């Protein structure tokens, strides 16, 4: 079992930081999961995922490099094994790397033992192919066991699987602590791009809002958080999936949004590793001042 720990005072970001934008790029290429459960494996569905490794990831790397943005790439173990050249390029570009299950399995549907096996398999893939000790993790559709397993079996510094808070907090159990950095769908370029009735219409076809709508949605969230950031600590999760946001019109949404946000004083695009370091430093300082 585990419990949450929250700071007694408002978090304080480093001097000059008003709104950190925490960038996540999901890099996945699953072949055994489908939008349509009766079609597995589903060549139609997984060929869409392949676009990320073939084109989308490279386009996103170019855009992030153009703006000097270094974020976190959440990579599935099987995707790393199939397309190691993408992950090596991500690492070379200076981005942080985190695990994102093995083949994007929905962990909420799996037994605890199976989830642990897949987590270990993913961690091993990063150690073997990249020489990388994973510092962070985001599970696909977390189960009731996910946090327990992270605390009991792994030495991650942060997890990003939950959707339940505006700011990071500590989860504590099994004699250790992990920082939980929540994210949500409302600033996910993939999800704000989908239609109001969900990804698939009654006719079984994709519904999609326009790129212009997606950009407006991101700007609206940014404006609200930037205003709030004048009074207290806030952060903005910004999530992209390379097989969706890496397509030309969606990639332009990311490019244009970064250009927009960079105009504002105190806005910093950052990775989960960096945000975790800032948060932990302030949390320790608060505890020391109380002691």
Residue ranges of model-derived segments:
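Catalytic alpha-helical scaffold of carbohydrate-active enzymes acting on polysaccharides/glycoconjugates
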Residues: 1-188, 215-238, 244-291
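Glycine-rich, positively charged active-site loop/lid region within alpha/beta enzyme cores that binds
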Residues: 182-207
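Surface-exposed cleft-lining segments at the edges of enzyme active sites
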Residues: 134, 201-212, 242-243
